[in-house]
């Protein structure tokens, strides 16, 4: 396990997320941290390459927090940024390509085929991470979007439903209790 790369990425992502130029705010760091945590869990459960999955999870949104103008195509720009970073660590080209594929195919809003188990782990971890940040979603609804109680609740419920529906079938089964528990509270 390349802990040198992972530790560097944790710090680098935190630094980038902390900058005033990051339009998503520091909350984006906690989203990425939750993605990395869930990605590691899924990698173990589905016997994926943990190193590839964890590194990909830390890098999956790097373009978005680096430059907001890259957001729409952040999966493409992020793969390129990841390659540049990983080359600085003399990371194997074959592994760099696997990380790039995970980043290119992590977006649930873009229906790219997720061919490898590593790609599925990262995409599913990205979707399920919203269940680990419900307070952030509520803050977004009530503070940033100025919604009333019912509008905010519906906003959060619909976001969580969309996220859950983006999961692979195996991850839906794995996270069903988490989904049911969140919905019962909301």
Spans of features found by a protein language model:
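Short alpha-helical hairpin
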Residues: 1-18
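Short coil-to-beta-strand
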Residues: 4-9, 48-56
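Short amphipathic alpha-helical interaction patches enriched in hydrophobic/aromatic residues
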Residues: 17-21, 43, 62-67, 86, ...
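Short, well-structured alpha-helical segments
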Residues: 29, 33, 54, 93-104, ...
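His-Asp-centered metal-binding catalytic motifs of divalent-metal-dependent phosphohydrolases/nucleases
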Residues: 50-68, 74-78, 99-107
């Amino acid at each position: 396990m390349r802990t040198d790369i992972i530790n560097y990425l944790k710090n680098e992502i935190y630094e980038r997320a902390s900058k005033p130029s990051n339009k998503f705010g520091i909350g984006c760091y906690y989203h990425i941290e939750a993605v990395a945590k869930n990605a590691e869990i899924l990698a173990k459960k589905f016997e994926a390459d943990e190193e590839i999955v964890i590194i990909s999870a830390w890098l999956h949104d790097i373009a978005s927090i680096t430059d907001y103008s890259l957001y729409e195509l952040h999966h493409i720009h992020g793969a390129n940024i990841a390659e540049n970073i990983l080359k600085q660590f003399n990371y194997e080209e074959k592994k760099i390509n696997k990380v790039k594929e995970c980043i290119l195919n992590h977006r649930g809003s873009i229906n790219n085929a997720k061919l490898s188990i590593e790609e599925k782990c990262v995409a599913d971890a990205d979707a399920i991470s919203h269940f680990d940040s419900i307070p952030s979603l509520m803050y977004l609804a009530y503070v940033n979007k100025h919604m009333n109680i019912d509008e905010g609740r519906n906003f959060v419920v619909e976001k969580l439903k969309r996220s859950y529906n983006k999961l692979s079938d195996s991850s839906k089964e794995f996270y069903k209790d988490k989904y049911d528990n969140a919905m019962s509270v909301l």
